[in-house]
């Protein structure tokens, strides 16, 4: 693991914290931040702006503290909801980005629209945060491949930890395709020893002629 520090925008870090507070309450969130070793964030969430100042280490520590306090299943629920909030915050802030993405996706099949949307938002993530992702695909899936991941930063595990990213992708895929949901599964995770993280998004089944 690297000792270098990388950052999320403040707004995304704030979204992780406010989503957690909505789920477990203000007092429990304060206890969780103490457990995470981040007492400075109690009643002092980052500002609602896109400056890259919320460390990957903080994202990772908050995720781990949820695992420690509530167990894997509840931590997954929290992380997925926080990911959805992160995506929605990005849309609300960057209306021009959303409009440009919608324009790019205005023509073509649903499959083509999703591919364009994923590539668009991968570029957006790479621009406004220190997370590094790329898009790949085959006949059955699109793959959101994460080269530098805040969710498992300096963590090791025997199960995937990228549920925050799953939430982002669920919200993004539904937004890009008129509310239709897709099956999304993390099948590679850096914390498990994989070189890169990868989430696969199942493509719609082609209708038989």
Q: Can you name each region flagged by the protein language model?
A:
Residues 2-78, 86:
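N-terminal low-complexity or simple alpha-helical regulatory segments
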Residues 17, 21, 118, 122, ...:
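Generic solvent-exposed, charged/amphipathic alpha-helical segments
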Residues 2-11, 15, 125-166, 174-209:
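Short terminal or interdomain "cap/linker" segment that borders an active site or interface and mediates
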Residues 51-164, 188:
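Amphipathic interaction/junction segments at domain boundaries or subunit interfaces
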Residues 23-24, 42, 62, 114-116, ...:
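Weak global preference for isoleucine
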Residues 36, 48, 82, 90, ...:
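Amphipathic, positively biased hydrophobic alpha-helical segments used for protein targeting
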Residues 38-45, 86-91, 188-200:
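Short, mixed-charge aromatic SLiMs
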